[in-house]
Amino acid sequence: MASPSGKGARALEAPGCGPRPLARDLVDSVDDAEGLYVAVERCPLCNTTRRRLTCAKCVQSGDFVYFDGRDRERFIDKKERLSRLKSKQEEFQKEVLKAMEGKWITDQLRWKIMSCKMRIEQLKQTICKGNEEMEKNSEGLLKTKEKNQKLYSRAQRHQEKKEKIQRHNRKLGDLVEKKTIDLRSHYERLANLRRSHILELTSVIFPIEEVKTGVRDPADVSSESDSAMTSSTVSKLAEARRTTYLSGRWVCDDHNGDTSISITGPWISLPNNGDYSAYYSWVEEKKTTQGPDMEQSNPAYTISAALCYATQLVNILSHILDVNLPKKLCNSEFCGENLSKQKFTRAVKKLNANILYLCFSQHVNLDQLQPLHTLRNLMYLVSPSSEHLGRSGPFEVRADLEESMEFVDPGVAGESDESGDERVSDEETDLGTDWENLPSPRFCDIPSQSVEVSQSQSTQASPPIASSSAGGMISSAAASVTSWFKAYTGHR
């Protein structure tokens, strides 16, 4: 037997025994032991590096005890006792588990009962809340039913009202259709009445006719009288007299110098091409020559009278047709003898603008209109062949014709328009100053002021003398050629 302490062998002091025989037995056992005897080898029992005093067989078999006498029980006996204790422990554990199994089941049942009670309470609360919500929903349902009933009755009333309104609308539609037919018939009767009044006015008081002059071209007359002018200059002047500025371009006018348009009689007429150079020449001569003008067939008087009558006719037509003119022009505008070239040109532009405006309102064929032909446009307006004469309603204004109307006399724009005496206020030029200018295409606007029609017609016509009319036409043609020649040489 060996001790696990690993120290030197000590004699066991037991009663009746000496240390010698024990030491001898140990030496014998050591000599008989097998294995390595190394000082550093660890003990397999205590895991120390003390000196080994047991044999390997005893250690393997467990046949060893403590040498110090603490416990005489062998290791193998301890091991057997440990195994027995473990088996008893397992038996005790099984018995304990078996004894506690009933309590565990009881606890499980108690937990289940508790959870069921909690769930029952929750279900009761949920049922109470559900009942409350059902009561609220039932009350809301009753209110909704009452509301739906009211809405249904209201819808029935609205349906009845709708049917009543539809019947009323059908009656109104029939009435409107009938009134529309009546209005159209009234418009037709009004147009016929206006047409008859206008035709009576233009046939009795203001007859407008086309008069053949039967005179030679003033350029040819001037070329025969003035040998200094070259043939090229004469041809250029003749070509210039046969062209007219229309819609932004120069067009050829075959009837430029062959015809004239008369108003109130053949002795009061205007040039067909809108050339008022005879009046300009008379104004210049009036400035240089003092004293009364004794010539009764002066073309300036004829032009002034024709323009004055045209102004009166335009104002009367605007009253009959119920059309507000865009430009304010008095009946006596052309009656004065002191009209300068600028004032005269401005007044002619106003008259042409008003005539074009009336032509637009009566849907005159735009291909026939030329902005500078005053009486010819007026003749087309009051012509018996005009289909829409006397009409009422909206109309469209042609912007290109209005722009072409601005080009009356190119020499006027560069002259003394800036002087204080020649300036014209807005009230004298435009009636629609308070209205907004709209971009093209422009439709008719109702001006803010009305044109006074009932003004005194104080202009007297010249005596109907055929010879004086012919002489006036010749003088006008000669003066026209002279003005063209002056303008031509001045520009050169």
Curated annotation (Swiss-Prot):
Record PTM Phosphothreonine, positions in chain: 429
Transmembrane segments: none
Region (Disordered): 410-473
Record has Membrane as a keyword: yes
Keywords, ordered alphabetically: Autophagy, Coiled coil, Cytoplasm, Cytoplasmic vesicle, Endoplasmic reticulum, Membrane, Phosphoprotein, Ubl conjugation
UniProt record, GO biological process: autophagosome assembly; autophagosome maturation; autophagosome membrane docking; cellular response to glucose starvation; cellular response to starvation; defense response to virus; early endosome to late endosome transport; endosome to lysosome transport
UniProt keyword annotation of Magnesium present: no
Membrane topology: Peripheral membrane protein
Biased composition (Acidic residues): 415-433
Cysteine repeats, as annotated region: 43-58
Residues that bear Phosphoserine: 29, 416
Effect of residue 43 to A: In Atg14L4C4A; fails to localize to the endoplasmic reticulum
GO molecular function ontology, one term from the record: phosphatidylinositol 3-kinase inhibitor activity
PTM comment: Ubiquitinated via 'Lys-6', 'Lys-11' and 'Lys-63'-linked polyubiquitin chains on multiple lysines by MARCHF7, leading to ATG14 aggregation and loss of interaction with STX17.
Cellular localization per UniProt: Cytoplasm; Endoplasmic reticulum membrane; Preautophagosomal structure membrane; Cytoplasmic vesicle, Autophagosome membrane
GO terms under cellular component: autophagosome; autophagosome membrane; axoneme; cytosol; endoplasmic reticulum membrane; extrinsic component of omegasome membrane; extrinsic component of phagophore assembly site membrane; mitochondria-associated endoplasmic reticulum membrane contact site
Chain residue ranges for the region called BATS: 413-492
Biased composition (Low complexity): 448-473
Known outcome of mutating residue 58 to A: In Atg14L4C4A; fails to localize to the endoplasmic reticulum
Subunit comment: Forms homooligomers; homo-oligomerization is essential for the roles in membrane tethering and enhancement of SNARE-mediated fusion. Component of the PI3K (PI3KC3/PI3K-III/class III phosphatidylinositol 3-kinase) complex I (PI3KC3-C1) in which the core composed of the catalytic subunit PIK3C3, the regulatory subunit PIK3R4 and BECN1 is associated with ATG14. PI3KC3-C1 displays a V-shaped architecture with PIK3R4 serving as a bridge between PIK3C3 and the ATG14:BECN1 subcomplex. PI3KC3-C1 can associate with further regulatory subunits. Interacts with PIK3CB.
Family: Belongs to the ATG14 family.
Record remark on domains: The coiled-coil domain is required for BECN1- and PIK3C3-binding and for autophagy. The final 80 residues in the C-terminus define a minimum required region for autophagosome binding called BATS.
Protein name: Beclin 1-associated autophagy-related key regulator
Species per Swiss-Prot/TrEMBL record: Homo sapiens
